[in-house]
C-alpha cells in the first residue's frame, strides 16, 4: 500500500486550499493507514487555536484537525523554522498534537512517501 503525504503550505481561510486538503486527507485515510501530514511555510497557521473565520464569512474547519487521531492519522509534523519565522516559536498549544521538527527532518521524512499532495 502506498504511503501518502499531505503538505499544508497556505494560510487558513484565504482560499479553499486548507479546507480541501483536510477533506482529501480524511477521505484518503479511509483507504490507507499510511498517511503523513506536514505543516510548512504559512501552513503552520492552520493549527492555531482561537481563529475567527466567521468574521470574514468563512467556514470554521480548523477544529476538524482535532479528529485526525480518531482516523488513525498520527504522523503529523510542524516545521520548526517556519514557526520561528512567524513568531510562533513560543506557542505550545495547537488544535492538533503535531510534532515540531526541523525542516531538514521533514525533507528526510518526505523521501519515504510514494505520493506527496500539496495544499
From Swiss-Prot:
It comes from the Bacteria. It is found in: Cytoplasm. Pfam families: DsrE. Coiled coil: none annotated. SUPFAM superfamilies: DsrEFH-like. Keywords: Cytoplasm, tRNA processing. GO terms for biological process: tRNA processing. InterPro entries: DsrEFH-like, Sulphur_relay_DsrE/F-like, Sulphur_relay_TusC, Sulphur_relay_TusC/DsrF. Its main location: cytoplasm. GO terms for cellular component: cytoplasm. Belongs to the DsrF/TusC family. Part of a sulfur-relay system required for 2-thiolation of 5-methylaminomethyl-2-thiouridine (mnm(5)s(2)U) at tRNA wobble positions. Heterohexamer, formed by a dimer of trimers. The hexameric TusBCD complex contains 2 copies each of TusB, TusC and TusD. The TusBCD complex interacts with TusE. This is Protein TusC.
Amino acid at each position: 500500500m502506498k504511503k501518502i503525504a499531505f503538505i499544508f503550505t497556505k494560510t487558513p481561510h484565504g482560499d479553499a486550499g486548507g479546507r480541501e486538503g483536510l477533506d482529501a486527507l480524511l477521505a484518503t485515510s479511509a483507504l490507507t493507514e499510511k498517511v503523513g501530514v506536514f505543516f510548512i511555510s504559512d501552513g503552520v497557521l492552520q493549527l492555531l487555536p482561537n481563529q475567527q473565520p466567521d468574521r470574514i464569512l468563512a467556514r470554521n474547519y480548523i477544529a476538524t484537525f482535532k479528529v485526525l487521531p480518531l482516523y488513525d492519522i498520527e504522523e503529523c509534523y510542524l516545521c520548526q523554522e517556519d514557526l520561528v519565522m512567524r513568531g510562533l516559536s513560543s506557542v505550545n498549544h495547537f488544535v492538533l498534537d503535531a510534532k515540531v521538527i526541523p525542516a531538514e527532518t521533514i525533507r528526510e521524512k518526505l523521501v519515504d512517501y510514494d505520493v506527496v499532495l500539496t495544499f
